[in-house]
Regions:
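Walker A/P-loop
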Residues: 16
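Glycine-rich phosphate-binding loop used to anchor ATP phosphates in small-molecule kinases
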Residues: 62-111
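Pre-Walker A (Motif I) flank of P-loop NTPase domains
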Residues: 1-4, 82-83
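ATP-binding Walker
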Residues: 13
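Hydrophobic anchor at the beta1->P-loop junction of P-loop NTPases
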Residues: 7
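Conserved substrate/cofactor phosphate-moiety recognition/catalytic segment
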Residues: 20-70, 76
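A glycine- and Lys/Arg-enriched "phosphate-lid" helix/loop adjacent to the NTP-binding pocket
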Residues: 52, 57-58, 108-119
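P-loop (Walker A) phosphate-binding loop of NTP-binding proteins
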Residues: 10
Length: 119
């Protein structure tokens, strides 16, 4: 069965180390790191003339959820071509949101995949 592995925890808790070690052990796997998307987010701050602050109301209102949507969309698409995908991202709000997790599991079920959360 296909799997989406979500390595999640608050920022700066060792997710990247754990994610990379797990990805090496499970190779072949599609590895997606939300930090890679930050380059795009930084540019949005510049274009909007906003100070770069990932805790700001501007970030919360205009960027945060789109980053998560983008990485999940990439992961779901990758499951069309690979049996395993690992996302390295905090997802701290999302894993506590029952409806969000149900929706994600439904999308994965349509792909013949299941969700594995590593906290």
């Amino acid at each position: 069965m296909k799997r989406l592995i979500l390595v999640t925890s608050p920022p700066a808790c060792g997710k990247t180390y754990v994610s990379k070690e797990l990805a090496k052990a499970l190779n072949p796997i599609v590895y997606l790191d939300k930090d890679t998307l930050i380059v795009l987010s930084k540019q949005i701050f510049v274009v909007a003339g906003e100070e770069y602050n990932r805790s700001s109301p501007f970030f919360e209102e205009n960027i945060r959820n789109y980053e998560y949507d983008a990485i999940v969309d990439l992961a779901l698409e990758s499951l069309d071509y690979s049996d395993r995908c690992l996302i390295n991202a905090p997802f701290t709000r999302e894993v506590r949101n029952v409806e969000y997790m149900r929706s994600l599991r439904r999308k994965l079920q349509e792909k013949g995949a299941r969700l594995v959360v590593v906290w």
